[in-house]
């Protein structure tokens, strides 16, 4: 997988119709920044933040939602606190109120201290991020959630390659399911073709494109986008 260069946001950022903007978001923000971000959240977002048991998780949720508002507000030309969200039946956030007609579509994923956000116009889009954490039952999880040929490929690999391949499969499937709004129950219906040296392709949905990402050491990610012919841009918040 290619390493991409994540650039600082330019002063006058524009999103063209054939672009997908990918944002790398550090969630461990200084306390002063966290307070500013919290001030932009809605009452239901603040209530969600307060339901986290661990303060670290509360802070990271606040940072992720506040920065998402900042990013989307920049494209919409409004203050972060003015951005309105609706939620699909499975809880996927989408733009609501007058912003629903903007054509701006986005998706957010986070793992530990990092989040990724994908934004574009008109194309359905999903993104997933996973840290390569030790998982003792990789093969049993793969047998449950992956197709037989995916499971067999994983089993055939040396032990040191299995973890990364497992999470590459997982992020590609999850990114597509997040884009379509389907739940994790359909993981085993999504076929991904990949090898340790070849990029992933969505066999189940040939009209969709996949891009794998390495946003940080020891993690993998993927973005699924409806259609082809789009250009990725990589920004660091």
From Swiss-Prot:
Keyword terms, alphabetized: Magnesium, Metal-binding, Transferase
Catalytic activity, as annotated: apo-[peptidyl-carrier protein] + CoA = holo-[peptidyl-carrier protein] + adenosine 3',5'-bisphosphate + H(+)
SUPFAM superfamilies according to UniProt: 4'-phosphopantetheinyl transferase
EC number annotated for this UniProt entry: 2.7.8.-
Enzyme class: transferase
The UniProt record lists the keyword Secreted: no
GO molecular function, one term: holo-[acyl-carrier-protein] synthase activity
Gene Ontology cellular-component terms listed: cytosol
Signal peptide span: none
Superkingdom: Bacteria
Residues given in the record as Mg(2+) binding sites: 128, 130, 174
GO biological process terms held by the UniProt record: lysine biosynthetic process via aminoadipic acid
Cofactor: Mg(2+)
Known function: Probably activates the acyl carrier protein (ACP) domain of HetM, by transferring the 4'-phosphopantetheinyl moiety of coenzyme A (CoA) to a serine residue. May be required for maintaining vegetative growth and probably acts via HetN to inhibit differentiation.
Sequence similarity: Belongs to the P-Pant transferase superfamily. Gsp/Sfp/HetI/AcpT family.
Protein name per UniProt: 4'-phosphopantetheinyl transferase HetI
């Amino acid at each position: 997988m290619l390493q991409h260069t994540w650039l600082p946001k330019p002063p006058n950022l524009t999103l063209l119709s054939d672009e997908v903007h990918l944002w790398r978001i550090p969630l461990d923000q200084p306390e002063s920044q966290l307070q500013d971000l919290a001030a932009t959240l809605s009452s239901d977002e603040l209530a969600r933040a307060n339901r986290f048991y661990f303060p670290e998780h509360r802070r990271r949720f606040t940072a992720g939602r506040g920065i998402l508002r900042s990013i989307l507000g920049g494209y919409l030309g409004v203050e972060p606190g003015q951005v309105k969200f609706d939620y699909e039946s499975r809880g996927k956030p989408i733009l609501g109120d007058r912003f629903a007609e903007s054509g701006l579509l986005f998706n957010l994923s986070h793992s530990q201290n990092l989040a990724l956000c994908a934004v574009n116009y008109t194309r359905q889009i999903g993104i997933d991020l996973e840290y390569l954490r030790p998982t003792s039952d990789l093969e049993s999880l793969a047998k449950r959630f992956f197709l037989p040929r995916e499971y067999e490929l994983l089993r055939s690999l040396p032990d040191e390659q299995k973890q990364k391949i497992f999470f590459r499969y997982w992020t590609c499937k999850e990114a597509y399911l997040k884009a379509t709004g389907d739940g994790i129950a359909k993981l085993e219906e999504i076929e991904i073709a990949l090898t340790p040296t070849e990029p992933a392709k969505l066999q189940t949905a040939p009209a969709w494109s996949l891009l794998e990402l390495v946003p940080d050491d020891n993690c993998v990610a993927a973005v699924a986008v409806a259609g082809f012919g789009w250009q990725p841009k990589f920004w660091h918040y």
